[in-house]
C-alpha cells in the first residue's frame, strides 16, 4: 500500500529518532518466566477513583442540551487535497460554557476550568485529554482517507474513532456518506472521547453543522433556523440549533440508515466490551485514532484497545493511527507504539500486520496502518 501525497514506507535512520528511557516491549514468553501476564486493558489503574469510566452517551439527550444554542463555525480545507471541513470555533465553545456556568453558579469543576482556558493547559491526565482542539494528525488522516474515499465508503459498514475530539476524519466520512446517499446499506459511526463534554460541545456540533451545510437547501437553511420567527438573524457562519433543525438532523440521519454512537470515558476492558457490543454484526470496520499515544503510561492500553477491535469475530478491521514521531516533554513516541505492536503480533502469532508511513511535514509525523489478513483495501 502507498499514499502518493507524501507518505513513504518505514525507512528511518537511527539519528532521526530520540530513544525513550522507558520501553513497553515485553513478550508473552518473558511473562511466563516471571509473573502471570496481565493485559494492559485489565490494569488496576484504569478502575481507580478519579478515572472516568466508560459510558454510552445518549445522542438524544446531547441534542436536547444543545437546543437554542447558536454555533459559530469555521469552514476550511485539508492541507494536501483541500477537502472541505468544518469545525466549531473554540471561542464559541468557551462562550457556551460561560453561559452555562452563569446559570449554574455553584459549578466548581476542575475540568470546566481547563476547558475555559483558566489554567492554560492543553490537557491534564484523567481530567481533560485535549479534545476541544483540532490537532495536526487529524488533518493527516483526512487527506489519507480522501485518496480512496469512494472505495472505503463502499467497503465499510462501521467507523470507530478512538479519542475523536473534534472528529474531523469521521466528519469527512460522514459528509461522504451524506453525498453518496446510499440508504440501502447501513453505516455505524462510533465516536469515543475521554470527556463527555467534548462529545457534546464539539463532536456532535461538528456533525450537525456538516449535515446542515451538505444536505439543506438555502430555503431549508433559513426555515429550520427561523422556526416561524422572522426576526431571528441568520448568516452563513452560524447555525442556530432550533428544535426543528435538531429533529430534522436526527430524522434525516436515521432515514439514511446512519447511526451515531457516542462513548465517553477511559480505555480498558469495560471500554473494549462496549465497542464489541456496539460493533456486533459489523463485517467491515474502519478504526481511526490520532494523537492518542502521547502518554507512555497509556501507550500499551491504546495498543491493546486497537488490537482488541481486530479480534472482533467474523469482522475485517483496518486501523489508521496518526501521531507525531516524538512527543517532546511528554514521553510518548510512535516508535514505542510500533515496537509494542510488532512484539505483540509476533509473540502471539496474530493474523495482523502493520506498516508505517511518514508524513512530509516540518514537524515529523507518521501514520501506522494495521490490518487483519482480509481487511478493507
UniProtKB/Swiss-Prot annotation:
Phenotypic effect of disruption: Loss of Protein-histidine methylation. Impaired early rRNA processing, resulting in a deficiency of 60S subunits and translation initiation defects. A haploid deletion mutant leads to hypersensitivity to echinocandin-like antifungal lipopeptide caspofungin, a 1,3-beta-glucan synthase inhibitor. Deletion confers sensitivity to the synthetic tripeptide arsenical 4-(N-(S-glutathionylacetyl)amino) phenylarsenoxide (GSAO).
Alphabetically ordered keywords of this record: Cytoplasm, Methyltransferase, Nucleus, S-adenosyl-L-methionine, Transferase
The EC number(s) this enzyme carries: 2.1.1.85
GO biological process entries: peptidyl-histidine methylation, to form tele-methylhistidine; positive regulation of translational fidelity; regulation of translation; ribosomal large subunit assembly
GO CC, one annotated term: cytoplasm
Source organism, top-level taxon: Eukaryota
Subcellular location: Cytoplasm; Nucleus
UniProt function note: Protein-histidine N-methyltransferase that mediates methylation of RPL3 at 'His-243'. Methylates ribosome-associated RPL3, but not free RPL3, thereby regulating 60S subunit assembly. In addition to RPL3, mediates His methylation of other proteins.
Family membership: Belongs to the methyltransferase superfamily. METTL18 family.
PANTHER family from the UniProt entry: HEPATOCELLULAR CARCINOMA-ASSOCIATED ANTIGEN, HISTIDINE PROTEIN METHYLTRANSFERASE 1 HOMOLOG
Protein name: Histidine protein methyltransferase 1
